[in-house]
Amino acid sequence: FLAVDCSPAGDIYGDQGAIGEGTLIRFFDPGHLMLPNMKDFLLTTAEEAGIKYQYYCGKGGTDAGAAHLKNGGVPSTTIGVCARYIHSHQTLYAMDDFLQAQAFLQALVKKLDRSTVDLIKNY
């Protein structure tokens, strides 16, 4: 399961999540901890596809937190974009980050097959 979401930018305060630094790969949030093989799959795919990315550990949750509990466990992750003023009527993000996230999702879907899912689940 690939959740697509915006996460709050913390770059003004020197925290993680910088606008303009690429798509987000969320390894952890209070409702979800990524499987180690999912992490490997994401990082390998990003490197192979030349995707600009940044690590992110969120304080809020995403749909990946609910999805990974369904049907005996669904491998899940969140791919996102850093933004300011999320949950408001005026969200601000970098278009290049959005395009990197879009390209990353396309690369992931092209590589994702049954054997890859089985490998991800084998922790």
Region spans (language model):
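Acidic/histidine-rich catalytic neighborhood of metal-dependent amide-processing enzymes
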Residues: F1-R26, G60, T116, I120
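Active-site-adjacent substrate-binding region
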Residues: L24-Q102, A107-Y123
